[in-house]
Amino acid sequence: MGGKWSKMAGWSTVRERMRRAEPARERMRRAEPRAEPAADGVGAVSRDLEKHGAITSSNTAATNADCAWLEAQEDEEVGFPVKPQVPLRPMTYKAAVDLSHFLKEKGGLEGLIHSQQRQDILDLWVYHTQGYFPDWQNYTPGPGVRYPLTFGWCFKLVPVEPEKIEEANEGENNSLLHPMSQHGMDDPEREVLQWRFDSRLAFHHMARELHPEYYKNC
């Protein structure tokens, strides 16, 4: 039975390979790296991206302030394209830690006086180059030190001492438009704040400890 096929060698090997072969879907599932979860403290849009891989109809410019803000930036001149070059994704714990150390090593953020415009520029740059939706850089309320809500982000906002503010505003070379001269206009507590790196924030989620009410849905 089988004619010339009965003389073909190697079938037993092929049969074993066929038996062990996984279905294509299962093989693809095993090959795909598991996506990292969004970091604790990110906003609603990032939670959408984590759960659904996209922004759903529950978060639009009409219902979500971060979506509305981002949409408005498309018409602004910020020095680089607003739309991301890479797939949109939520900020993760590891990415927040890595970004913190990158900015610490490169310099430019440590000790910089905070303003909403400067924060917006940083958020848009991270969004454009890395695809992280800009609802991750939020802080606890004042007065005093403002801790990041997103676990892994190691920059906090620290009030500048009044003496240093007064010293910086002395003389004729100071600019009234500089954030140091704005006397905390962006801040509800009217405090002048500056970014400060704190490596302990990678291990100690101060915001969650101080304000557990912000994390009820996490």
Swiss-Prot record:
Region Disordered, residue ranges: 1-44
MF annotations from Gene Ontology: GTP binding; SH3 domain binding
UniProt main location, coarse: host cell
Subcellular location: Host cell membrane; Virion; Secreted; Host Golgi apparatus membrane
Record motif PxxP, residues: 84-87
Bias (Basic and acidic residues): 14-37
Keyword Transit peptide recorded: no
A Pfam family reported for this protein in Swiss-Prot or TrEMBL: F-protein
Miscellaneous remark of the record: HIV-1 lineages are divided in three main groups, M (for Major), O (for Outlier), and N (for New, or Non-M, Non-O). The vast majority of strains found worldwide belong to the group M. Group O seems to be endemic to and largely confined to Cameroon and neighboring countries in West Central Africa, where these viruses represent a small minority of HIV-1 strains. The group N is represented by a limited number of isolates from Cameroonian persons. The group M is further subdivided in 9 clades or subtypes (A to D, F to H, J and K).
Entries under InterPro entries matching the protein: HIV-1_Nef_anchor_sf, HIV-1_Nef_core_sf, HIV_Nef
Membrane topology field: Lipid-anchor
Regulation: induction: Expressed early in the viral replication cycle.
Site (Might play a role in AP-1 recruitment to the Nef-MHC-I complex): residue numbering on this chain: M18
Superkingdom in the source lineage: Viruses
Placement of sequence motif Dileucine internalization motif: 176-177
Transmembrane annotation, as ranges: none
A biological-process GO annotation: symbiont-mediated suppression of host antigen processing and presentation of peptide antigen via MHC class II
Self-association state and partner proteins as the record states: Monomer; cytosolic form. Homodimer; membrane bound form. Interacts with Nef associated p21-activated kinase (PAK2); this interaction activates PAK2. Associates with the Nef-MHC-I-AP1 complex; this complex is required for MHC-I internalization. Interacts (via C-terminus) with host PI3-kinase. Interacts with host PACS1; this interaction seems to be weak. Interacts with host PACS2. Interacts with host LCK and MAPK3; these interactions inhibit the kinase activity of the latter. Interacts with host ATP6V1H; this interaction may play a role in CD4 endocytosis.
Designated name of the protein: Protein Nef
Region (Acidic): 74-77
Lipidated residues (N-myristoyl glycine): G2
The species this protein was found in: Human immunodeficiency virus type 1 group M subtype B (isolate BRVA)
Residues flagged as site, Cleavage: W69, L70
Modification note: The virion-associated Nef proteins are cleaved by the viral protease to release the soluble C-terminal core protein. Nef is probably cleaved concomitantly with viral structural proteins on maturation of virus particles. Myristoylated.
Residues bearing PTM Phosphoserine: S6
Mediates dimerization, Nef-PTE1 interaction: annotated span: 120-136
